[in-house]
C-alpha cells in the first residue's frame, strides 16, 4: 500500500506522512556527524570527515565548513551535491542583501530564505527534497551569536547545542547532559568528548574538521583549527579519560 504514496513527493499517505521527505532525512542519518555548540564567547562546530583514504589528496578534499558571508557560516550533513546548490543560494542571498542595504544579512533571515526554498521542493511534482541538513552559525547585531539547524522539510530551529548526521541522537543526549553554558575552550573540549563517545571509529585529527566563530575588533572571525590544535584537544581528552578510569578503580 505504501508504494502508492512513497514515489510521489507531493502526496500524503493515509497516515499523513510524506515518504520522500522521510527518505531524505534517512539519507542524512548515514552522513558524517556534524555538531555545533554555542558558548558565551563564540560558536564551535565540528564535522566528521567520512571515508578518509590514504590516497586522497588533502589539498582538494571536500570542506565541511562553508563561509556564507562575513558574519555567517554553515556545516552540512547529507548529499554533498545538494549541499553545494543550497550553499550557492545562501551566498547569493547574503551578497544581494549586503549590496542592497549596505549591511550584513541577519542570521535568521538568511536561514528562513533557504528553508522557504527547501519547503517549496516538498510541494513540486517531479522534483525531490534536498537530501541535506545544515547547521548555521553566525553573529548579528540583533541577537548576537546564533546556532540554527534545518532539515529537508524546510523546518528550522535555534539551538544552544545540537548535532546532525549519523549517531545524532546519542550525541544530542550527551549534549543535554554535559552542556552547562560553557566558555569557548570548554565548548571545544565538549565537542571532542561528544565525538569521542559517538563516532564509530577512533577519533583522530584527520577524521574531524573543527572551526570556531568569534568576534574580534568588531569583526566576525571564522578560524579553522589546525591538525596540531585538534590533536592537542584529543590528547587532553584521552588524559582525562585515563584519569577517570584510574579514579574508578581505586
Swiss-Prot record:
It comes from Caenorhabditis elegans. Belongs to the peptidase T1A family. Gene3D superfamilies: Glutamine Phosphoribosylpyrophosphate, subunit 1, domain 1. The keyword Ribosomal protein does not apply. GO terms for biological process: proteasome-mediated ubiquitin-dependent protein catabolic process. Keywords: Cytoplasm, Nucleus, Proteasome. GO terms for cellular component: cytosol; nucleus; proteasome core complex, alpha-subunit complex. The proteasome is a multicatalytic proteinase complex which is characterized by its ability to cleave peptides with Arg, Phe, Tyr, Leu, and Glu adjacent to the leaving group at neutral or slightly basic pH. The proteasome has an ATP-dependent proteolytic activity. It holds the Pfam family Proteasome. It is found in: Cytoplasm; Nucleus. Its main location: cytoplasm. It comes from the Eukaryota. PANTHER family: PROTEASOME SUBUNIT ALPHA/BETA (PTHR11599). The 26S proteasome consists of a 20S proteasome core and two 19S regulatory subunits. The 20S proteasome core is composed of 28 subunits that are arranged in four stacked rings, resulting in a barrel-shaped structure. The two end rings are each formed by seven alpha subunits, and the two central rings are each formed by seven beta subunits. The catalytic chamber with the active sites is on the inside of the barrel. InterPro entries: Ntn_hydrolases_N (IPR029055), Proteasome_alpha (IPR050115), Proteasome_alpha-type (IPR023332), Proteasome_asu_N (IPR000426), Proteasome_sua/b (IPR001353). This is Proteasome subunit alpha type-4.
